[in-house]
Each structure stands twice: as C-alpha cells, then as structure tokens.
Amino acid sequence: MANAPVQRMSKLMAKTLRDDPADAEVLSHKLLVRAGYVRRTAAGLWSWLPLGKKVLGNIERIVREEMDAIGAQEVQLPALLPREPYEATGRWQEYGPELFRLQDRKGGDYLLGPTHEEIFTLLVKDQASSYKDLPVILYQIQNKYRDEARPRAGILRGREFLMKDSYSFDVADEGLAESYALHRAAYQRIFERLGLDYRIVAATAGAMGGSKSEEFLAPAEAGEDTFADCPNCDYAANTEAITFRLTPVDATDVPAAEDIPTPDTPTIETLAASLGVEASATLKNLLVKVDGEIVAVGVPGDREVDMDKVEAHFAPAAVELVTAEDFVGRPDLVRGYVGPQGLGEKVTYIADPRVAPGTAWITGANKADTHAKNVVAGRDFEVDTYVDVVVVREGDPCPNCGTGLKLDRAIEIGHIFQLGRKYADALKLDVLGQNGKPARVTMGSYGIGVSRAVAALAEQHADDKGLVWSKEVAPADVHVVAAGKALQTELALEVSDKLAAAGVRVLVDDRAGVSPGVKFTDAELIGVPQILVAGRRSGEGVVELKDRRTGEREEVTVEEALTRLTS
C-alpha cells in the first residue's frame, strides 16, 4: 500500500474556534466553522480550508466511483454560459432573479450556470448523429450559481455550491426509464456509502420540467424541505407534490344559497367568530395575479394557501399577490368579501380538491359587509381547475391509503428527473433512428449536492463535542494527539510515520505551547473516527485509543495500536 501523507496541525491552515459564529443558525454551520473546515467569504460564499477540501474530495470520489459503475462518462463544461440556449428553452426568463446574469465587454449576455441541461443537450447534438451513438450518460462535478435572496444556514443555502450533475440521452422512453433506474440505484449506493440517513420521495419538477421527479432527502431539523411519510404504507412525498383526492359529495339536501349580512368581517377569523361556526365551514378566496391577470384561489377557511404550489402550477408565468390598486375599477371584486359565485369570465377560479363538487360553504357574496351561506361547488359556482394548493398539515390523509401523514424536515441532497423531450424539442436534438428517419432524443437530469452533503453529514453525525465523521468521508483515518512533552511528541510523530507508511491517513496534533486539554477538545471537535493519544505512559510504549463515535477508550501498546489501525 502506498504511503499516505501525514498532516501536521502545526502546519495546518485551519484554526479551531471555541465559540459559535455569531451568525450561525444551524448545527452544521457552527461545527464546520469552529472545527476549521470552512470560512465565510461573503454572504452565501464559502472558502473550503484543507480539512473541508479533503471531505469534499472523499465525497467526490464516492460519487465518481458509483457514476462510473453505471457507465457514465465524466466531462467538464464551462460555468460561464451564453444566453442563447437558455433563451431557446425559456429558462432565461423562468429562472427570474435567481439567475446570475452578466455581460462581456462587447455587450454579449451570459450567465453563471445554475444547471447545464441546455449545454449538455448541445454537446450531444454536436457529437451524436445516430441511434448507435446512444444511450449515453454524461456527468460533471462543478460549482453552480444561484442568486439566493437570503443565503442562510452556512453551506446549506449559498450562492455558489458544488454539485454533481449528470444527463442521460436515449432514443426511446423505455431507455430513459432504464437510465433513470440506473441513477436511482447509484444514488442509493452513494448515500449509503456516505452514511447518510435518507428518504426517496415524490417531488415536483419545477422549472426543470419533465414527467417524473424524485428527491433524496436527509432528515434534519435544519432542513428547508418538508416531506410527508405515511406510517401505514410506503408513500413518501415532498409536501409540494402531495395531491388530495377529489371526492364529490351529494348536495341534494342543501338549501339554496342565501346572502347574510356580516358587517366588519373581512377575515376568516372575524367571520367565523361572528357566525359562531368553525373556520373549516368557510371558503377562503385568495386573489393573485398571473402574468398580470387576476386569478382567484379557493381553499377551506381553516387552511393556508401554499404559494409554492400555486407558482408551480402556473410556471413559468409570474405569480404575485394582488394589491389595493388591483381593486380599483373592479366592482365585481370587493376586498374581504370575494366569493366564487358571480366572478364572471374575467377571473379564472382554481380551487383545492377539498372544495369538491357538492361541498357547501359560507363565502363572500361580492358585496360589502355581506357573505353567502349554502354556496355549493358545482351548483352555485364552477371551478375552472382543481389544484392541490393548501399547506400540508400533520395528520392529513395519505393519498394512497388514507392514514394520517407524518411530517418531517429534511435537507435535499439529490434530485432526479425524467425530462422527456423538453430540451431536445427546444434545441432540436435529433439522431437518425433505426428506421432511417430522424428520432427526437429523450433526456434525464440528475443532481447531487456535493457540498450540501457535507452539511447534511454534519447535521446527522455530530454530538455535543463536535463532528463524528465516518471513515469513508473523514479528512483522516486517525487523529494522533501528542499530549505535550518532548517524549510524547516524539512518539506521536513516530507512530504517525508508521501508520502513514501502511497507507493510513494521519492528522497529528504536534502543536507546541497548546495544552493537552485543548488538543483533546479539538480532536473531538474535528471528528476523525479514531483518536490515538501519546500521553503519560509514552515512556512505556503505551498509548490510548479512542473511538470517536462510541467514546470507548483503551490503553494498548504501540504495536497493538498499529496492528488495529492498519488491519
């Protein structure tokens, strides 16, 4: 086995900190900064120090091994990209303010790549001419850029982040399904090797487009995603992808709709209190503008509208809430008293499936200080489109079996898409088919957040003392600590050299003038799997071995320590 380098902490460009950073909100942010893995450069921009770079490198290695195992080929494309391909697919506009746009000295428009679907499509268009050239899977590991409005949580949500993005190209849909399955299995192997607890959940495609999408989520309190798990069946989904069943009910016995005076009740809370009813008996109607046109969104009064779902439904159109000015010159829209009946053709009405045909509601009467009761969906008003647009709650019924769902927070660490022909259509990617005619290529897109995986590991694998890395991703295999005296330092360096000669990666704390207590604290903070201490019994050739994860410690001879750590 080749010699591994010994990293001396006396030479290491990584200072540990006793206190949490003032702006740190989540555990991974605190520990990665305190342990000397990363440093903040600016809002959403991070510098990776030597220890952090080693962890990143280990994750990259695992990703490469598993991608290569499914026949994927690694390439490197530019991060600075021309506008034209993104204009052709519509994403120059769709990405909105999250896209970093810039111009060269001649006024040409460019962007910093958030993902590379367009550029990979053009690459394959240039290289592949026949069905014989396909299928092919290409990937890269590269920094991506998104102009986050509020970068937060350390490396979890930054403006620059390291990502593995891969793309599959097939002639037939069956081939796309196979490429998708290959990636799905590879991702499972990757995250299992990393030691991450994860869930595979149904997801929405968003601006990426496509017919099928799944996310790989790492459960963690610091996560920005919320997913639902069914305790009774195998259903799991990002809350944005959950769809409530549309179940019509019989409204034969519901009396005719009737206006009722309700002065000073412009909110659901005041209305329910005034009438002595539950908020769930009322119908809330939220007005939004979609590319400037007013749309009404109907949900039960006890539920909140999930604007992410509304935006996803209308994507790529821009969605915004109405303002007071939008009511001017619109006598049919009475602020605080809007109802779906009588809105007219000028206003599109979408409703949550809970507002099913036959359900009866108390809702606005489109008159000041007036509501209407016994307003029945499908009888007194029509719904243009049913879309699940409510914020999912704990206990909502599972779409598969009806059992109450359980909600958890998680970090998105991977996302896979069956894109279909969206990008091939926009950029005219065809190859010569087996029948001698042009065949439009179908495509998949697959991402892993490499730098985000570091944060997810730090969230899941830590204790009150610091980080606890697995051997696969740790910056070293063994952290050797010289307690301080010359004899102890000499033994520590000797053991380190022998371990390195056997191929063991060693981080040795040989710092002079640093107390043993500080060294021990730093060793636990940094989180290398095995800690070897050359301490008070160094003169006897005895050292202490400590397992960072379990906390178990044992005094053994140097020879025994070397045997254990090199076996």
From Swiss-Prot:
Its EC number is 6.1.1.15. The keyword Acyltransferase does not apply. One of its GO terms (cellular component) is cytosol. It is found in: Cytoplasm. One of its GO terms (biological process) is prolyl-tRNA aminoacylation. It is an enzyme of class 6 (ligase). Pfam families: HGTP_anticodon, tRNA-synt_2b, tRNA_edit. InterPro entries: aa-tRNA-synt_IIb (IPR002314), aa-tRNA-synth_II (IPR006195), aa-tRNA-synth_II/BPL/LPL (IPR045864), Anticodon-bd (IPR004154), Anticodon-bd_dom_sf (IPR036621), Pro-tRNA-ligase_IIa (IPR002316), Pro-tRNA-synth_IIa_bac-type (IPR004500), Pro-tRNA-Synthase_IIa_type1 (IPR023717). Keywords: Aminoacyl-tRNA synthetase, ATP-binding, Cytoplasm, Ligase, Nucleotide-binding, Protein biosynthesis. One of its GO terms (molecular function) is ATP binding. It catalyses: tRNA(Pro) + L-proline + ATP = L-prolyl-tRNA(Pro) + AMP + diphosphate. Its main location: cytoplasm. The keyword Electron transport does not apply. Catalyzes the attachment of proline to tRNA(Pro) in a two-step reaction: proline is first activated by ATP to form Pro-AMP and then transferred to the acceptor end of tRNA(Pro). As ProRS can inadvertently accommodate and process non-cognate amino acids such as alanine and cysteine, to avoid such errors it has two additional distinct editing activities against alanine. One activity is designated as 'pretransfer' editing and involves the tRNA(Pro)-independent hydrolysis of activated Ala-AMP. Consists of three domains: the N-terminal catalytic domain, the editing domain and the C-terminal anticodon-binding domain. Homodimer. HAMAP family: Pro_tRNA_synth_type1. Belongs to the class-II aminoacyl-tRNA synthetase family. ProS type 1 subfamily. This is Proline--tRNA ligase. It comes from Streptomyces coelicolor (strain ATCC BAA-471 / A3(2) / M145).
